[in-house]
């Protein structure tokens, strides 16, 4: 009986305790209800402010938009979006300090670090501070090495600054992000410009120093670009100008033996450390394989001029003019005829050149010939 009485008493006490705890819980819940209601109301207000702020920004009411968006950033469920839009509104009012502050707030959210950084870079570019934008983008590119938007924007800034070494160094990452073909034009432009910059680099008073720098750079050029005719022509041309004619000639001959391209023979015009007679032998060998090729004929004519072989030069230019109506050949021919004292032929060559131009000019009224 005692044991049973104890069990009954314990059960009663437990039931009473449950009732009391339930009552206390309900009381606490009811006491917190106004707090939750207040929070819900604040979030609803913040959402309306975010929506209204965005619409005001679209309508060009930047000051009103900024005020609404800042309030939404402080109380709403979407603080990241609110701070980013507030930064845009402040930037449009040229309030740099405020826009930077809002972007810092956005950066505090891990998800907003990259987009806030991109906006900082864009604002810096808009304000005329490309170096500041570049520094910001470099940090972002290290944080997110595969982010396409960051990499492309960074590349555009480097290209606008003509920092070809940095852009060429960035190209492997760009190609991994976008694929081999997407950035091929930018890569080609960058390496062509870097070759030119190196060949004309200030501080090198001697051609030997610049030529050596150029050769070192050529080793770093990607293999597929070393097979690009325009790239080969640019590099070989600079080598020739800097006294590396033998290397330039070997490079041109090697490439042409694999694949012919009319952009390569003119490199021989810049070679001064090989005799014109030897160069003419090479050119005449190419002409035997490709008779009437205007690029080779014009180059041969100019090399013949260097050798003071006037008759031979005239023959090459005439052949080029007759085979292709080359404007360059006609101009060279007119100049040579004039120098030889044959004004009549010089005038005829000039008129043939002019007739070519007339086909490219718009049809417009002209004065009648005077009687």
Locate the predicted segments by residue.
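TPR/TPR-like (Sel1-like) alpha-helical repeat modules
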Residues: 108-109, 142-143, 155-180, 249-262, ...
């Amino acid at each position: 009986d005692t044991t049973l009485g104890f069990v009954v008493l314990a059960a009663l006490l437990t039931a009473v305790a449950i009732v009391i705890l339930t009552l206390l819980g309900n009381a606490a819940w009811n006491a917190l209800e106004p707090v939750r209601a207040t929070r819900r109301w604040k979030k609803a207000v913040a959402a309306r402010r975010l929506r209204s702020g965005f619409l005001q920004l679209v309508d060009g009411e930047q000051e009103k938009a900024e005020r609404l968006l800042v309030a939404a950033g402080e109380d709403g469920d979407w603080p990241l979006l609110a701070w980013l839009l507030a930064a845009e509104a402040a930037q449009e009012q040229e309030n740099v300090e405020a826009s930077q502050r809002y972007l810092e707030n956005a950066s505090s959210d891990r998800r907003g670090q990259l987009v806030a950084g991109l906006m900082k870079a864009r604002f810096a570019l808009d304000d005329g501070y490309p170096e500041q934008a570049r520094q910001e983008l470099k940090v972002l590119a290290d944080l997110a090495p595969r982010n396409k938007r960051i990499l492309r924007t960074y590349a555009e800034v480097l290209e606008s600054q003509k920092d070809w070494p940095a852009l060429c160094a960035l190209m492997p990452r760009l190609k991994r992000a976008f694929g081999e073909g997407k950035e091929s034009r930018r890569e080609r432009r960058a390496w062509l410009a870097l070759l030119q910059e190196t060949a004309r680099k200030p501080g090198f008073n001697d051609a030997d120093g610049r030529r050596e720098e150029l050769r070192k750079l050529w080793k770093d050029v990607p293999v597929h670009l070393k097979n690009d005719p325009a790239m080969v022509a640019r590099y070989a041309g600079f080598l020739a100008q800097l006294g590396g004619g033998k290397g330039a000639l070997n490079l041109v001959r090697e490439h042409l033996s694999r694949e012919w391209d009319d952009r390569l023979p003119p490199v021989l015009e810049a070679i001064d450390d090989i005799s014109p007679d030897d160069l003419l032998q090479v050119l005449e060998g190419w002409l035997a394989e490709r008779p009437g090729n205007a690029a080779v004929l014009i180059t041969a004519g100019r090399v013949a001029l260097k050798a003071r072989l006037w008759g031979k030069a005239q023959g090459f230019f005439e052949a080029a003019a007759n085979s292709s109506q080359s404007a360059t050949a006609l101009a060279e021919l007119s100049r040579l005829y004039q120098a030889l004292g044959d004004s009549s032929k010089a005038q005829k060559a000039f008129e043939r050149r002019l007739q070519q131009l007339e086909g490219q000019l718009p049809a417009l009224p002209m004065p009648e010939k005077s009687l």
